[in-house]
Amino acid sequence: MPKRVLQGVVVSDKTDKTVVVRVERRFTHPLLKKTVRRSKKYHAHDEANAWKVGDTVWIEEHRPISKLKNWIVIQGEKRAEV
């Protein structure tokens, strides 16, 4: 079975070797027929502490690393500096 891969934005990088990634999904409400946005936060392993707040990253399912971490960062894009 293939591992799930999700795209999200880093919202916290305060802990060592860990980033918190907010993944947003969109769906059509069954009754209102309106597009609804929902988000969920995932704790992901970042071995090199390379990703900072605002970066877009892709995370992949992994074996449990700790109580909260079941995902690892596989790639990403740095946020454009303004």
From Swiss-Prot:
Which InterPro entries does UniProt cross-reference here?
NA-bd_OB-fold, Ribosomal_uS17, Ribosomal_uS17_bact/chlr, Ribosomal_uS17_CS
Its GO biological process annotations read: translation
Q: Which GO terms describe its cellular component?
A: cytosolic small ribosomal subunit
A single GO molecular function, which one?
structural constituent of ribosome
> What NCBIfam families does the record point to?
PRK05610.1, uS17_bact
The family line of this record is:
Belongs to the universal ribosomal protein uS17 family.
> What name goes with this protein?
Small ribosomal subunit protein uS17
Q: Which organism is it from?
A: Xanthobacter autotrophicus (strain ATCC BAA-1158 / Py2)
